[in-house]
């Protein structure tokens, strides 16, 4: 082939849309709950002073049945990554949350008394050449109050690649993304947060104001080869980064064996059928089968209050404060395994998997990784498989086939 004949081919390659496998490092931080506990604050006080529960607003009815509501809060979120908004990108740390569908960050126009806003990074539309005004007001309800602001449109870079933080990991730019500029964050909840905002990765059905979620926009713009994303969360508390979110594929170095998939039972949250929960000491919960949400924005395992109370008793955990249960650290190795059956397959959690070592008042405590919360019918009861489970089992979210995949996570 003559050199001149290579030119048209090269031009075609340059003009073709770029599909990418995007890696976003995840960093582990101390949750709001632990931060407040370590300084003597009470989560009950937080709840009284400012709402923390996730979406409680009504969602427009569709043909697939009722939407689960008030599933969780961000008190226990522990992993964040970095994105950019605007041109040039303004960098923000966000929780990549499969339990919600909206992107929001603090606005430079936040209220004077919004302390949480002033101690986090803020989006400034005047500094972006790709900003498009929208102005529609939005409210995300958190119990008795709401996070509010207005919608804007701009380019979202994943991960953030500003001139001062160029990344060798590759990335994508999602154009014409509508997001929330938060001008009011309720109560004092978000003051203790190590993250600036939230990037929701659930289905469009639960998106506030029917805003197209970032990953859906990314799919429409054909920025990845496969419409899937996967999470590896390191169980090593000192590991940096603390994990990785991959857009467009999976990485076999992060798991052992093969992936096993379950179909999504309701395309709102990433909801799957849970066959049952077995404690090796003989207790069986969710005996007739139940529904579960796979949620990267929650660090704990969450289940109905009465059933989780039985589980805590079976593993010898005693109530502490703020809904937490304590286990004597010297007894952790003797505790029974807990197995979740999903799709007919058992996913075992060892005592080391489902207990958490934390510091409080200068002492090391061991806490149960399970917490009780009732989701009322018709949406509930529901279990939430949070980072305790995802850290043990590499998790793939497949929008092409509407399914969730699990495989035993590798220890790196």
UniProtKB/Swiss-Prot annotation:
Task: Please report the PTM annotation for this entry.
Answer: N- and O-glycosylated.
The entry annotates sugar attachment on: 63, 134, 263
The source's superkingdom equals Eukaryota
Q: Answer yes or no on keyword Secreted.
A: yes
Q: Where is the active site?
A: 97, 295
Q: Which InterPro entries match?
A: Aspartic_peptidase_A1, Aspartic_peptidase_AS, Aspartic_peptidase_N, Cathepsin_D, PEPTIDASE_A1, Peptidase_aspartic_dom_sf
Q: Which GO terms describe its biological process?
A: antigen processing and presentation of exogenous peptide antigen via MHC class II; autophagosome assembly; execution phase of apoptosis; insulin catabolic process; insulin receptor recycling; lipoprotein catabolic process; positive regulation of apoptotic process; proteolysis
User: Which Enzyme Commission numbers does its entry carry?
Assistant: 3.4.23.5
Reported tissue expression:
Expressed in the aorta extracellular space (at protein level). Expressed in liver (at protein level).
User: Keyword set for this entry?
Assistant: Alzheimer disease, Aspartyl protease, Disease variant, Disulfide bond, Glycoprotein, Hydrolase, Lysosome, Neurodegeneration, Neuronal ceroid lipofuscinosis, Protease, Secreted, Signal, Zymogen
Q: How does it assemble?
A: Consists of a light chain and a heavy chain. Interacts with ADAM30; this leads to activation of CTSD. Interacts with GRN; stabilizes CTSD; increases its proteolytic activity.
Q: Which disease is it linked to?
A: Ceroid lipofuscinosis, neuronal, 10: A form of neuronal ceroid lipofuscinosis with onset at birth or early childhood. Neuronal ceroid lipofuscinoses are progressive neurodegenerative, lysosomal storage diseases characterized by intracellular accumulation of autofluorescent liposomal material, and clinically by seizures, dementia, visual loss, and/or cerebral atrophy.
Q: What is this protein called?
A: Cathepsin D
Please tell me the species this chain comes from: Homo sapiens (Human)
Q: Which gene encodes it?
A: CTSD
